[in-house]
């Protein structure tokens, strides 16, 4: 009877202290990933140091699924520079190129952007009544990229069941691996 139970429930044969150790190991993996992310945030100066290009608006510079590394260094922005910005009321950041910079008398400046593959500037994407972006909208400058690496993120976003399935499989794998 015990043999049948151990085949049905593979965790029944594992000592409780080993299960606890596996749970701690899983927690350490999650904590390490969070620390790496926080470290990237501090090192890059950006709230989102890595983003995935979600549309084709920046073709030929970037394609859907490219993974961008961002940096938010001090210094003036330049026309032609690729930036990532967030619009109030929209949760997904946008990757586009600076089209115009309007310097104001107080030393601050306004920025207008456009996707390389778009026919018009981004004023239509901004909040109603907004004509320019300020520095506060910019979350980073594109400093490097890895082609197509972000497609995994896009597939998981498009098929959320796959994301939960993969997390479940990884959790079972980590918890059931014996050391």
UniProtKB/Swiss-Prot annotation:
Residue ranges, annotated region (C-terminal short (CTS) helix): 165-176
Its membrane topology: Single-pass type II membrane protein
Molecular function per GO: peptidase activity; serine-type endopeptidase activity
Any one GO biological process: signal peptide processing
Domain of life: Eukaryota
Primary residence: endoplasmic reticulum
EC number: 3.4.21.89
Localization per Swiss-Prot or TrEMBL: Endoplasmic reticulum membrane
Reaction catalyzed: Cleavage of hydrophobic, N-terminal signal or leader sequences from secreted and periplasmic proteins
The name this protein goes by in its record: Signal peptidase complex catalytic subunit sec11
Organism field: Dictyostelium discoideum (Social amoeba)
Recorded name of the encoding gene: sec11
């Amino acid at each position: 009877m015990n043999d049948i139970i151990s085949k049905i429930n593979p965790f029944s044969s594992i000592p409780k202290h080993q299960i606890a150790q596996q749970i701690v190991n899983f927690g350490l993996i999650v904590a390490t990933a969070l620390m790496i992310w926080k470290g990237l945030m501090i090192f890059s100066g950006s709230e989102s140091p890595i983003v995935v290009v979600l549309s084709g608006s920046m073709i030929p510079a970037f394609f859907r699924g490219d993974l961008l590394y961002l940096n938010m260094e001090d210094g003036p922005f330049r026309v032609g520079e690729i930036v990532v910005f967030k619009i109030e009321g929209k949760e997904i950041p946008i990757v586009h190129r600076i089209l115009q910079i309007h310097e104001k008398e107080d030393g601050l400046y306004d920025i207008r952007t456009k996707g390389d593959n778009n026919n018009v500037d981004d004023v239509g994407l901004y909040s109603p009544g907004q004509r320019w972006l300020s520095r506060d909208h910019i979350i980073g400058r594109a400093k490097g990229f890895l082609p197509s690496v972000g497609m995994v993120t896009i597939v998981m976003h498009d098929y959320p069941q796959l994301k939960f399935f993969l997390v479940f499989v990884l959790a079972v794998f980590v918890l059931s691996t014996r050391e």
